[in-house]
Amino acid sequence: MERFDAIIIGAGAAGMFCSALAGQAGRRVLLIDNGKKPGRKILMSGGGRCNFTNLYVEPGAYLSQNPHFCKSALARFTQWDFIDLVNKHGIAWHEKTLGQLFCDDSAQQIVDMLVDECEKGNVTFRLRSEVLSVAKDETGFTLELNGMTVGCEKLVIATGGLSMPGLGASPFGYKIAEQFGLNVLPTRAGLVPFTLHKPLLEELQVLAGVAVPSVITAENGTVFRENLLFTHRGLSGPAVLQISSYWQPGEFVSINLLPDVDLETFLNEQRNAHPDQSLKNTLAVHLPKRLVERLQQLGQIPDVSLKQLNVRDQQALISTLTDWRVQPNGTEGYRTAEVTLGGVDTNELSSRTMEARKVPGLYFIGEVMDVTGWLGGYNFQWAWSSAWACAQDLIAAKSS
């Protein structure tokens, strides 16, 4: 049986980065993945350009039942540290919006960078490999793979969550946690589009493809200012993806479709200047024409001129456009979700090393645990930071 200092399961962002760091410090590392190629989710991210971090990373941008857990790792390995690595590899990047950093060229550059870093650390890759069983003994862990048995002193689980099953997502990491007696919190899809109840969906389907700036608010008071997109299945766009992580089934969200307009002042000014202008054409100055026309067809916008718009109808219109209350039917689920909420309970782990408190030598990094970031590079930064924190402990174990 071949033995390694550390075996890392999952050749995604966290798994590759942790492997590279430990390998370059002299640890003998085996990196296992069930896919044909490493970094499959990286390649799909950011429209193929990988939103690899965010300039404004802070603990408040992460959801967890233990909101303090992420602070240590994020402080010890920051976005600036990862940007330095990207720069060292000569990868050109740009800020798109709200601090989101993307490769100028392709997400493949980030995968190639991580593979190169792993090669520098003499990391052994074993792809297309299924872990059939994991057992612990006095020397560490023994893993049965399809075709071989391997052993290690330290075992790192970096298998991610349940989002995007088409890219190989599975509950493997949760099962390992449960096998060793660790609590796993209920999971659900996060950063995911909303589906709508049939009557509302049928009313809005003709708007598929229409995008508008918005401010969207969850019942718990969380607010995001981002674009909203109407789709054939419901609502999407950055605003909806962000708020979906804070939404619970049965709840409403409030949507302001005119976040940059004081609608009452605008209507009064336009009435004074153009009293005979139709309300529809007036609103089309700030809203997509297709949206205005559809809302008028649905009776949400009166078919009147500005001088005919009475006070009661104006107030109702303002409420419709700035406090549109929508009760989603649900979400599109893990198939299109960018992340998984919940997972391995962080109270079971050391925030400094990511090691299981009750199982020495067993670590969890990245999305598999109950830490979920906002849209915009935050989840990649958690992968880098948690991987770095874990790697430091793997390195310290070797030196000691």
Language-model regions, residue ranges each:
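Glycine-rich FAD pyrophosphate-binding loop
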Residues: 7, 23-47
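A glycine-rich dinucleotide-binding beta-alpha-beta segment and adjacent secondary-structure elements
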Residues: 127, 293-372
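Feature captures the FAD/FMN-dependent oxidoreductase FAD-binding
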Residues: 76-154
